[in-house]
Amino acid sequence: TGCTVTAQAIDLTEGIQRGTAYASSLTDSENAAAVDFAVRLFQNTVQDGETLLLSPFSVLCALGMTANGAQGETLSQTEAVLGMKKEALNSYLLGWQTHLSQGGQTQLHLANSVWLTADSRPTVNKSFLQTNADYYGAGIYKAPFNDATCKSINAWVREKTDGLIPQIIDAI
């Protein structure tokens, strides 16, 4: 594979604890917005004759986490695509995580992270780190996006999936 060099990514959330956050009660309007997003996602992604495994929930989480760092026109466009404001989306997705993790014989373990290039110009605000920790339990990492980062991402995924997914990328 293209992953051969060993190096450590910088964990920007080191020392940040997951705090208390408001989980939505999963209202009809929030569910309708999420279903609308999922339908549009599939309509714009799936090609005839193609087999695809795609999780709208995972895509919503990824876009929700990145929306927490967006401002201005980027944030407005993201919220328009998602069908709700970022604060509502954060609460909605936390509500689903809570609901899916409760009781029964079902076991659900979600793992989220954001990876930034080491040469990222924007400053990462503590509020971005804290919000993503509170609502998504997400780690935020800074890395050079080279072969070493490939190895770090695969190690992160392997750890979070208890080895069920040993490798997710071959190269960056």
Regions found by a protein language model. Name each.
Residues V5-A33:
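N-terminal low-complexity, Pro/Thr/Ser-rich intrinsically disordered segments
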Residues G19, N68-L100:
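Active-site-surrounding "flap" and adjacent substrate/cofactor-binding loops of secreted or lumenal enzymes
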Residues L52-V59, L63-A70, I168-I172:
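Active-site-proximal helix/loop microenvironment
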